[in-house]
Amino acid sequence: MASGGAFCLIANDGKADKIILAQDLLNSRISNIKNVNKSYGKPDPEPTLSQIEETHLVHFNAHFKPYVPVGFEYNKVRPHTGTPTLGNKLTFGIPQYGDFFHDMVGHHILGACHSSWQDAPIQGTAQMGAHGQLQTFPRNGYDWDNQTPLEGAVYTLVDPFGRPIVPGTKNAYRNLVYYCEYPGERLYENVRFDVNGNSLDEYSSDVTTLVRKFCIPGDKMTGYKHLVGQEVSVEGTSGPLLCNIHDLHKPHQSKPILTDENDTQRTCSHTNPKFLSQHFPENSHNIQTAGKQDITPITDATYLDIRRNVHYSCNGPQTPKYYQPPLALWIKLRFWFNENVNLAIPSVSIPFGERFITIKLASQKDLVNEFPGLFIRQSRFIPGRPSRRNIRFKPWFIPGVINEISLTNNELYINNLFVTPEIHNLFVKRVRFSLIRVHKTQVTHTNNNHHDEKLMSALKWPIEYMFIGLKPTWNISDQNPHQHRDWHKFGHVVNAIMQPTHHAEISFQDRDTALPDACSSISDISPVTYPITLPIIKNISVTAHGINLIDKFPSKFCSSYIPFHYGGNAIKTPDDPGAMMITFALKPREEYQPSGHINVSRAREFYISWDTDYVGSITTADLVVSASAINFLLLQNGSAVLRYST
């Protein structure tokens, strides 16, 4: 075994290095400490690392402190009151178990669901789209309205997968069912924490949505989606695909743009063929020689690369299915003591208090939706030269009856902490006074054109930051066929539908004067659709006592730049362009230590105003503001109260 060679650390002694490293100070301290230790007669005069770290950081020296013994376990609690059905309230009592309680997560299982069987319609003469006309579909030879003649039109019934259905058949089809996006977030409409009848904090599903948009880190998003019932895409790949490499620096390359007049005038040097061959060796080796010889430079004009495509698909709760299996949800609570173990509530300080978590559950119609189970297929032959056959589809949707979804395994998992009796007694005897952060939320309706201003009367106490969004009323309307998708988005959502036409057959035109014999096409039954969220706030302003704190800032500044710059790893830039953040703290959510606020209890004339081209008398919206407010929790006499209530 070889011995290590001598190693010499070379230190630069420039002016900047003297300031950053302070090597002279370090040498002087080591010498002084040695002299002092020798004067005291210590057998080992060398300084300790802790003495060195009084002035210099030692990167390779780890530290630890002894810690107070602590243990924890999760305890399951059943509802104290309330019927466990969708649309009701459930109240969970927090038992006197353990010395502290910290994390809490709700567990529920939504039962299987499906839609009812329906009879297939028949062909008839009734006008399509007429109110109450639900029995007949268009007759052959007429357009979709069943009134305008259309030569060659033939109609049949198919299911969402193109399989034929016989008209007039009893119990011929049923609609597919699917869950809304993030059903775990929507399930908890409101969550409240009470002690001895005093509400200490509460929040709504809008707050949960905004926390996810701004605060759930990307590396934990997959796990979060699994918990709240949001499907996660699965990656698939194609087989190998052969690609031609196009390099504008390579000679004899075919023109990518026929009208590029500068193509023959380029003065850049040609790429070395050996360089390209090293990166794209596919046409340098054949099947027999691949891997057996060195890459040989070639001068051929074509270089090849073998790749494969990546595809994504989903099959979770948001995918329409005839039968949705039971769905297990795990929903984390968002009170201050749930987020930070340093703020765990000492249960021993409230020995006789009644501690409750009350949850208002969403109704079934907000969670589950139907997808059309029947489509009308129009096949049209158009004679002539060229002759054409076009196939188009339109959904035939009549709402069915979804079975009542059961709600089972309703449990609240409470993380209880245990400490030694000595520490236990300290918390029993001492009055506890701690800084906490609670939710303050205001939802205000607006229908003013172009500009509006709202007084934030529901906000109070010192505010560190606010999450803000303007949500169109249409997003949660029962009339919106996509409300299952739009309910949590702070903007107007439009659908970008891919061109649905595929060419089934195109005859070859072999003479300039002749038309092709046929040209046929077929559309998708359900075309690929991409939702696009359009932010509806152009500019936003914040004023207090008539002083502009934010004066007509573009919405992108608050939706992208503020969360990008502030908050470190605790805040992320949301995907939703309509979700905005305004902070009065330098380090929002980063540290327990406050770093800035505005006390809206003192500045009561606190307004938010905005400009918009969307909102009007018909296109109304709701302004949602979720603020982090500072208060103080006082634990004494067996109860817990907030220091400030107004």
From Swiss-Prot:
It comes from African swine fever virus (strain Badajoz 1971 Vero-adapted). Homotrimer. The membrane-bound form, but not the cytosolic one, assembles into large complexes. Interacts with the minor capsid proteins M1249L and p17; these interactions form a rigid zipper structure that stabilizes the capsomers. Capsid protein that self-assembles to form the pseudo-hexameric capsomers of the icosahedral capsid. The capsid is constructed of 2760 pseudo-hexameric capsomers and 12 pentameric capsomers, with a T=277 symmetry, about 200 nm in diameter. The capsid encapsulates the DNA-containing nucleoid, the core shell and the inner membrane. Plays an essential role in virion assembly. Involved in virus attachment to the host cell. It comes from the Viruses. Belongs to the NCLDV major capsid protein family. It is found in: Virion; Host endoplasmic reticulum membrane; Host cytoplasm, Host cytosol. This is Hexon protein p72. Signal peptide: none annotated. It is a peripheral membrane protein. One of its GO terms (biological process) is symbiont entry into host cell. InterPro entries: MCP_C, MCP_C_sf, VP_dsDNA_II. Keywords: Capsid protein, Host cytoplasm, Host endoplasmic reticulum, Host membrane, Host-virus interaction, Late protein, Membrane, Viral attachment to host cell, Virion, Virus entry into host cell. Induction: Expressed in the late phase of the viral replicative cycle. GO terms for molecular function: structural molecule activity. Gene3D superfamilies: Adenovirus Type 2 Hexon, domain 4, Major capsid protein Vp54. Pfam families: Capsid_NCLDV. The keyword Membrane applies. GO terms for cellular component: host cell cytosol; host cell endoplasmic reticulum membrane; membrane; viral capsid.
